[in-house]
Amino acid sequence: MCTNVVRVFVILYLLAECGCIKYDVDDNVHICTHTVMSHINYTSWYYNDKVIALATEDKTSGYISSFIKRVNISLTCLNISSLRYEDSGTYKGVSHLKDGVIVTTTMNISVKANIIDLTGRVRYLTRNYCEVKIRCEITSFALNGSTPPHMILGTVDKWKYLPFPTDDYRYVGELKRYISGNPYPTESLALEISSTFNRFTIVKNLNDDEFSCYLFSQNYSFHKTLNVRNICESEWEALNNNDNASSVPASHNNLTNDLSSMTSQLQNDDNDYSTPMNVDNLIMIVVITMLSIILVIIVVIAAIAIYKRSKYSRHTDN
């Protein structure tokens, strides 16, 4: 428990290092001084400590090319419309007052953009277990005078932290590892972590399934989240569908065989029975049978009578 608390504080501390105001792409921002305009002699405006314009009572000059169409600068304000990701950085206005006093206004701006690619790929899958490799990669990043980036990937209980000094690390895709000694192309930086899930484990804390990737520096802060268990659930469902699909033909054949067997049995049963007789034939048979029985009875009675008569005649003669 103590370890988890420490990790949370570390993450929050690192994320707090940005110290900037966050905007979305296409937002508008206004950076203004609270000094009365009539008291200002001129104002110099800076972006990451580079002069971008000089504003006087009569005119403003020295726009940098990328700001010409999107920036309105005066003695007291710098207004930027339709923010871009590359506009992130430190803005400063230095106003020189007519009485010789210098007033400085500073603002750190972070423009959120989709420069992080967070993906999960299944490496091993069974009906009960699923292993996923989670990868967080910087797809595009311009320092723009900021400090080198730092990256955190994982959950509260399982995470990796990696700083990227500009002269120490470079990720080489062909080698699938980081090498040192050369400046890195920031767009190739990545962190990877693996995690295993049990299909039948009861999820008590949904945060255990949520993997987050943080990228931050002095003027930048980016964050993406991925539910990795959902990836495994999709794969398990696909596996079940494949199993069901493969069992359908066998079941269909069995059903067909059963129906054929039943049909054949019925046909055989029909063959075992003779064709039904009509009523007239049946009556004729009954009459003949009865007459035959009567005839047999008459013959028997006659035979008995003849036998008795012949026996009586012999007795009389004697």
From Swiss-Prot:
Transmembrane segment boundaries: 282-302
GO biological process: viral process
Sites where a glycan is attached: 41, 72, 79, 108, 144, 219, 244, 254
Keyword Repressor in record: no
Principal location: host cell
Membrane topology recorded in Swiss-Prot or TrEMBL: Single-pass membrane protein
GO CC, one annotated term: host cell plasma membrane
UniProtKB keywords: Glycoprotein, Host cell membrane, Host membrane, Membrane, Signal, Transmembrane, Transmembrane helix
Induction note: Expressed in the early phase of the viral replicative cycle.
Cellular location(s): Host cell membrane
Signal peptide limits: 1-20
A Pfam family matched in the record: Pox_I6
Function as written in the Swiss-Prot or TrEMBL entry: Plays a role in the spread of virus to neighboring cells ex vivo.
Record-stated family: Belongs to the orthopoxvirus OPG049 family.
Protein name as it appears in the record: Protein OPG049
Organism whose genome encodes this protein: Monkeypox virus
